[in-house]
């Protein structure tokens, strides 16, 4: 049997649970499908269900066999369902666990699963339930992988108790050094992804994913602190998480003023200038770059126009709007500065982006150069 119970609510007083398999052949099986219920007349009677005979269909999935209509049985007809002692024991044990689930959790809204028959997992869950701040801190992007590796190292070591005692006795300075080493490892991992993909990967989704997993990189662009509000945020719909309207790749905000920052992501291969001269020594910005600039400015205009509607609809749905539109910043991340091999190329690009009043243009290699700078700073 599985070590967890899957639960899906069907109403506020009932939830169907995963099937309990009692008998099985290569083509048929008998299952019991339990439900946990809120029984107001008899609170202890909190589990019900039905036996289902299934056959394996052409798609290799289990299909319910035809249902019998008891009302059509004649006086001399009868139906017998027999299960052996092993199946009865399985059913009894599993049903008792479902009673325990209802007693502890009741009927909760949504779909979820609960672990069973594992006291170690139960202890872990109880620990985090009593200290939710600890769980939140451990699952932060920059700590979860380090936590996993540290735990694996401890439990596979011959003397885990000694390791834990040593960690407990570390001085504050030693802990700071340990945190620094973990931070450097994460920075180098991101830098490795950049070096491996910068010349070959032309997928916008890939680079959006890299920056989404490492949102702190984007924060390096700004002199003021910023926090991520949402990725692929809708700026022209009912809420910033709506399924229609315009969407910007990343929506950041200043944590103090809440002023919005809109970031549009292209790829390292995005051309920055045209290959041919406009005039002698003068090159125009490439249409892919100017298009991205126009796009993010359009998002800004739409957001400013729709902000009141977004805020109102968020309020109606109980969602807090975590950003404002005082003077929203716009950023485009595209191309690589290293591709501008000629002096005239670099001058034309710099003239273009420096004269943009409302949009900051930064290249991918400039962005990841800041990651290199952080590594050098931490390594001393």
UniProtKB/Swiss-Prot annotation:
User: One short Pfam family name for this protein?
Assistant: SduA_N
InterPro entries in the record, alphabetically? SduA_C, SduA_N
Ordered alphabetically, the record's keywords are: Antiviral defense, Hydrolase, Nuclease
**GO molecular function term, any single one:** nuclease activity
Does S-adenosyl-L-methionine show up as a keyword for this record?
no
The GO biological-process annotations, alphabetized, read as: defense response to virus
Function summary = Only component of antiviral defense system Shedu. Expression of Shedu in B.subtilis (strain BEST7003) confers resistance to phages phi105, phi29, rho14 and to a lesser extent to SPP1. May be an endonuclease.
What this protein is called in its record is: Shedu protein SduA
């Amino acid at each position: 049997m599985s070590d967890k119970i899957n639960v899906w609510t069907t109403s506020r007083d009932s939830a169907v649970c995963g099937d309990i398999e009692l008998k099985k052949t290569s083509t048929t099986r008998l299952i019991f499908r339990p439900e946990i219920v809120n029984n107001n007349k008899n609170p202890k009677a909190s589990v019900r269900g039905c036996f289902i005979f299934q056959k394996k269909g052409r798609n290799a999935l289990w299909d319910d066999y035809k249902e019998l209509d008891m009302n059509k049985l004649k006086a001399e007809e009868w139906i017998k369902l027999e299960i052996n002692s092993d199946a009865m024991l399985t059913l009894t044990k599993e049903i008792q666990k479902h009673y325990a689930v209802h007693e502890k959790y009741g009927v909760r809204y949504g779909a979820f699963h609960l672990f069973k028959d594992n006291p170690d997992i139960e202890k872990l869950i109880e620990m985090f339930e009593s200290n939710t701040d600890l769980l939140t801190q451990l699952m932060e992007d920059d700590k979860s992988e380090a936590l996993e590796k540290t735990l694996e190292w401890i439990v596979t070591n011959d003397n885990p108790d000694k390791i834990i005692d040593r960690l407990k006795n570390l001085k504050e300075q030693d802990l700071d050094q340990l945190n620094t080493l973990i931070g450097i490892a994460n920075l180098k991992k991101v830098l490795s992804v950049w070096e491996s993909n910068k010349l070959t990967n032309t997928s916008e989704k890939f680079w959006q994913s890299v920056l989404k997993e490492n949102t702190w990189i984007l924060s390096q662009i700004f002199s003021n602190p910023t926090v991520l509000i949402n990725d692929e945020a809708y700026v022209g719909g009912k809420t910033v998480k709506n399924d229609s309207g315009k969407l910007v790749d990343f929506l950041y905000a200043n944590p103090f003023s809440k002023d919005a920052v809109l970031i549009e992501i292209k790829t390292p291969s995005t051309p920055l200038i045209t290959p041919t001269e406009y005039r002698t020594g003068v090159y125009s910005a490439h249409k892919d770059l100017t298009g991205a600039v126009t796009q993010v400015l359009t998002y800004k205009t739409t957001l400013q126009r729709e902000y009141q509607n977004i805020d109102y609809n968020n309020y109606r749905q109980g969602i807090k709007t975590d950003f404002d539109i005082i003077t929203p910043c716009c950023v485009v991340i595209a191309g690589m500065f290293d591709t501008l091999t000629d002096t005239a190329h670099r001058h034309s690009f710099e003239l273009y982006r420096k004269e943009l009043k409302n949009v900051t243009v930064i290249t991918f290699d400039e962005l990841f150069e800041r990651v290199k700078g952080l590594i050098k700073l931490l390594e001393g």
